[in-house]
């Protein structure tokens, strides 16, 4: 096969365009700064495989609980128990991330996830799985996630450096969202043919990919913080609160977590009750959301430096609100797929820009705490979003819950965008700022703009 490919590439005539195209493709890939680092390539490859398995488990588990209980509320509680420990522990986890050997502890914590998936598979295969077992394992997984998430996020900058951080975050998000396409699609097939236990076992095996990637990372090429500086648990919050742009984005992220992202918790009920779909259709909706998010993440990974970061964040936030509001009003599967693509793309753009602005504004010795604060909001508050969306979906229907959440997100996005000058003309701040995207926030008296 290799010889055939070489022959085609080096052949003349009509096929001689390949030697001209392939270097351009290679150059485009290498232009993504984070991929120039071997350690990051190992990390992201393992992450992608593992995340595909994680999404397979997530889809199969949600559908299993829905079949066991026939309750939107009890299905949403899986997300609640998985995320509630993050609310309690992730700020502490962020402080720990600033102090520990991140590679070693990531390997330890990923091993726990492997054991949890294996336990679910054994229980399901033996016919012993019950809703209390699901809740208990979700709770234990949440405890580990409270430490794993800030450690993993803070490890990105150590692998690629601050100048390539946005592309690393975008590629990490791309892996997450591409796996959201692949995982649910595979789960729909595997769950329908082999049952949920197979999905859980596949997830357990997938963790070996990320463990191998972490093991092969060369620690000599990792730029860890050697300053020795330490800060209290409030340092991350105090830093964000002092800067106008990060403060606004944190407020907006809080609203999105409580009223926007909660749609994932009630998507199984929306698929069945509003669209008349079964597990295959639910997997298709999840994949549509993942396709949109992956498109947004890959776009920013490739050309994100060309955009004004805060403008992208706020425009994407407005698009999230509009797409969710419309999604709650439709009952046609094809239209719902299109709207979920838009919602996924917009959420990814907003999340990546927010995460990048927060991390690049933070000094090295408190970056873990800033990431911990972000995780506290995005994951720790998610149980409350899932709970309120599930309760409203139970009382008034999943369509109403999604439309209401979209309306709240839209109002919040418009208010924050207006307060941060999105609808006012920008001054000409020079060619360097236009090239790098380092624009000041107009309503910031000191012109700092949140450290972008």
Question: Positions of the model-derived regions?
Answer:
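C-terminal transmembrane bundle of multi-pass solute transporters/carriers
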Residues: 7-10, 88-92, 99, 115, ...
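Juxtamembrane intracellular "pre-TM" segments in multi-pass secondary transporters
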Residues: 19-40, 219-251, 435-447
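Hydrophobic/aromatic positions within or immediately flanking transmembrane alpha-helices
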Residues: 44, 60, 76-79, 106-107, ...
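Helix-loop boundary and gating motifs at the non-cytosolic
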Residues: 25-85, 242-287
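Substrate-agnostic recognition of the 12-TM MFS/MFS-like secondary transporter fold
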Residues: 41-58, 81-97, 101-116, 133-192, ...
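Helix-loop junctions on the cytosolic side of multi-pass membrane transporters
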Residues: 154, 158, 200-228, 417-432
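Transmembrane alpha-helix termini and helix-breaking/packing motifs in multi-pass membrane transporters
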Residues: 62-69, 120-126, 182-202, 273-274, ...
């Amino acid at each position: 096969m290799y010889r055939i490919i070489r022959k085609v590439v080096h052949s003349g005539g009509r096929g001689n365009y390949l030697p001209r195209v392939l270097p351009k493709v290679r150059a485009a890939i290498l232009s993504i700064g984070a991929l120039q680092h071997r350690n990051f390539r190992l990390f992201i490859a393992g992450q992608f495989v593992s995340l595909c398995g994680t999404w397979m488990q997530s889809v199969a588990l949600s559908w299993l609980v829905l079949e066991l209980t026939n309750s939107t509320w009890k299905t949403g509680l899986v997300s609640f128990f998985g995320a509630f420990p993050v609310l309690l522990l992730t700020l502490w986890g962020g402080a720990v991330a600033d102090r520990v050997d991140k590679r070693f502890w990531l390997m330890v914590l990923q091993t726990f996830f492997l054991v949890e998936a294996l336990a679910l598979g054994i229980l399901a295969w033996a016919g012993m799985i019950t809703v209390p077992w699901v809740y208990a394992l979700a709770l234990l997984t949440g405890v580990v996630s409270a430490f794993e998430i800030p450690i993993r996020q803070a490890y990105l900058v150590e692998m690629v450096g601050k100048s390539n951080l946005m592309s690393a975050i975008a590629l990490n998000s791309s892996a997450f969202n591409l796996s959201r396409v692949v995982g649910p699609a595979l789960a729909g097939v595997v769950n329908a043919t082999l049952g949920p236990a197979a999905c859980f076992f596949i997830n357990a095996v997938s963790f070996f990919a990320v463990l191998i990637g972490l093991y092969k990372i060369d620690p000599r090429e990792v730029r860890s913080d050697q300053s020795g500086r330490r800060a209290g648990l409030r340092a991350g919050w105090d830093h964000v609160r002092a800067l106008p742009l990060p403060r606004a984005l944190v407020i907006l992220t809080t609203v999105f977590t409580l009223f926007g992202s909660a749609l994932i918790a009630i998507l199984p009920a929306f698929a069945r009750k509003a669209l008349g779909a079964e597990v295959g259709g639910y997997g298709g909706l999840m994949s549509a959301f993942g396709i949109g998010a992956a498109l947004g993440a890959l776009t920013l990974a490739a050309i994100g430096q060309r955009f004004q970061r805060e403008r992208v964040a706020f425009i994407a936030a407005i698009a999230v609100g509009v797409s969710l509001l419309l999604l709650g009003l439709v009952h046609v599967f094809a239209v719902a797929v299109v709207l979920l693509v838009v919602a996924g793309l917009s959420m990814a753009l907003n999340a990546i820009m927010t995460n990048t602005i927060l991390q690049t504004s933070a000094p090295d010795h408190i970056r873990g705490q800033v990431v911990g604060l972000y995780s506290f909001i995005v994951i720790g508050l998610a149980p409350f979003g899932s709970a309120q969306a599930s309760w409203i979906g139970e009382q008034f229907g999943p369509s109403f819950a999604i439309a209401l959440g979209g309306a709240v997100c839209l109002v919040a996005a418009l208010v924050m965008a207006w307060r941060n000058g999105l609808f006012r003309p920008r001054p000409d701040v020079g060619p360097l700022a236009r090239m790098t995207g380092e624009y000041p926030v107009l309503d910031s008296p000191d012109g700092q703009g949140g450290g972008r």
